[in-house]
Amino acid sequence: MRFYTSVCRIGNNICVREQTDTGPNKYKVKYEPTLYTTSNAESGIKTLYGDDVKPVKPGTMSACRDYIKQYKDVGGFRVFGQTDYVLAYINEFYPEEIHFDIKRISAWVLDIETFLPEDENGRITGFPHPEDADAPINLIALQDLHTRQVYSFGYREFTGKADTKYINCGTEKEMLKQVVLFWNQKSVEICTGWNVDGFDILFLYNRIVKVLGVEWANKLSPWETVEVKKSTFRGKDQYKVIIYGVTVLDYMELYKKFSMSKQESYSLSHISLEELGEDKLDHSEYKNFNDFARRGWNEKFVPYNARDCQLVGKLDDKLKLLELAMTISFLAKINFDNVFGPVRTWDAIIHNALLKENKVIPLKDQDGDSHESIEGAYVKDPKVGFIRWPISIDAESLYPSNAIMLNMSPETYLGMVECSLEMMLKGISPTPGEMECLSPIGAKFRKDFQGIIPRLFEGLKITRKAVKKEMLQLKQQYEIDKDKTLPSKISALDNKQQALKILLNSAYGALGNKGFRFYNPNIAESITILGQYALKIIEAELDAILCKRFKMPEGTKFVVYCDTDSVFFEMGPVVDKYFAGKEKAVIVKALEKIAVDIIQHEVDHLMEKVSKMTNAYKKTLYFKLENVGDIALWVSKKKYIVRVHSSEGVTYAKPKYKVMGLDIVKSSTPAWVRTKLKGSLDLIFDTDESTVQKFLADSRADFIKLPVDQIAFPRGANNIDSFANPVTIYNSRSEGTTPMHVRAALLYNYHVKKLGLDGTYPLIPSGSKIRFVYLKMPNVINENIIGFPADEHLPEELGLDQYIDRDLQFDKTMVASMQNILDAIGWNAVEVSSLDAFFG
């Protein structure tokens, strides 16, 4: 077994760290890449479009850059090849499928603690800035992700108890030295942690530079090369530490990328509670963080730091996001930290696949001057209100399947003819040539060979299906014989099939990105509009077909909603006619059979029609049963609730709710309110208006007693500096209306600083998560709202608790959210007399 853990470029050298059968290895090589140029002679190597090219070796990577520049404007002379030389090297020297063992990778969780900056009188002056490292580090924890052992490095003696090996370094300077030496001794290959990219690693590196010098700081890299890159995002400077030879994988960013769930806060505290039911150690009994560090050192501070590492370790035990990222990386042959963007990932996949076929890629267009907008998916106006006995079907991997179906790829693209989706739906679109596919927007694709992109998509789909099948077989085997060798194999296969799924789902993100080497707006839009065609032909023709099949009155509507890759049907009339009086379980099973045997069958016929109209390369559009419910409620496009009894053939003992787009599932709704709203769904579906109104009245009484942070609105506060005014705090209407939550954040910052509390409480920086509440007027700040950081409490010193308008807060959160749902069925969330008062 041989696999890389880091491949990086330093000057003209490629620097490699890898794991082999004999252990870890690292080496540096002066890499001379291969480029390709146009050729009149047969060479056995061709471009994506079939032209002959020949290999050239200009020399070093710098020489290659100069070579490309030299011939850039020479007519009739073109250069081809992968100019991301790290990716080229990985593919060249790791040509086979890569198998890896995560346990052989030196992976560590990092968490640091710092003092807050103080003036000469010991007064806290704010919070530390990682780009300046303007406060001493007092504690550093590193946890081995495999053994789960935590090592804590501190500047003073520790006499308390903690689940860590404590090293008393005596001073900050010695502590930083010991950490660097330990880092090298353990040959750290991956460093993770919560917001480690945004704070810990940046602060640690800059602090080492400040205290020990850049030579010591650069020892964090096995190549003694570290770079701090500065960029600007939304007007805010951002810094990223690049430690050559070590991959920093921020677990918070992995969670945001791969967890598939939106959270009202991405603090470690919130996510740990959500995922593990565990929290960080509370230290609210101390005056401020410096007081906590000094007085609580032995009792809580050292355990607090260690626990942060342990929580990240436990999250990875459950979620296995590090292994998932590695699996994607090795499938694509990219570095671990490249997994966050689809463009580089798919650039590598396509380049590597083509090179195996002796084909080369064109140089990437550096201009990126395409300004076309791509039309997206189809969403049908729904039937608003209750839907009885809903069934939903969804397309299998819609966008990859569309690309396969019409053989959409740069080298198969033949240009455009006059055609539209409306023409195709009416059956008056032009007839494509025998060896041509025609998309609904008029893009033509050749059929005499399969293009690289559909070929890759199809290969990934087939591989994932096989891997998933093997995984399920091993799961079944484990249930029978409990073979202890199987769980690790099952986990590896599960990660691989998840990685393949993620790669497939991310493909359109690359194809529709103007920075992608193979970007073509006509291909990208052909993919989305073919999806529209599939849904619209179902909407247009299936109702009449089902009326005949079920012997229903002409004009009966079955298709009630379509969205991107899903179609929803109302089967209430069928249930009334054929299953009246039957138990729900019997009806659910009957509808499953109807969905598979009748609806899917008829949809397959319609997809055959789509295939014929487009002269498809192969039929790949298939729809399968998703959910069967007994009732649903549609509010508007992308906003609905379905009570699901069966999902993909699996029947639930107790039905589950699928909620889309409503405040019940939005992270901008307080968690307590979301929970209450979810608890009201059975009442909405099974009782009456007055029962729902009573539920709300009872909930108000509970709401009034809650702490402020539980009733406040969660929001993201972006670009707050652009709305700030040094005189009036925030922009007036004449200067451009300041969003309410931004105004709340600016007011908090102003009054915290005004009272000299900015050393005790963190200010709200632009881009952070906040909470805000309404205030009764008049009050001590003469404003109707106030905000505070999402993971903090509203400071008592502001004197605002007595002014919090809890009734208005309830109306704006709970009542308004409920009314948005009830409007669809003509109910009122509160009694009419109360409602009149609510709306003034």
Predicted regions and their residues:
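Catalytic palm subdomain of template-directed nucleic-acid polymerases
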Residues: V567-V596
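Active-site-proximal helix-loop-helix substrate-binding element of RNase H-like nuclease domains
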Residues: V150-F153, G160-Y166, S187, C191, ...
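DnaQ-like (DEDDh/DEDDy) 3′-5′ exonuclease domain used for proofreading
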Residues: M1-S187, A306-R307, L311-F330, D337-G376, ...
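C-terminal, non-catalytic extensions of nucleic-acid polymerases
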Residues: E592, V596-G840
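Active-site palm subdomain of RNA-directed nucleic acid polymerases
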Residues: K280, L535-T564
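Proline-aspartate-enriched helix->loop->beta-strand connector
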Residues: V179-F203
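Catalytic nucleotidyl-transfer cores of nucleotide-processing enzymes
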Residues: Q238-V241, F258, L363-R517, W634-V665
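Common nucleic-acid-contacting/processivity interface regions adjacent to the catalytic cores
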Residues: K287-N407, M416, K484-E541, Y561, ...
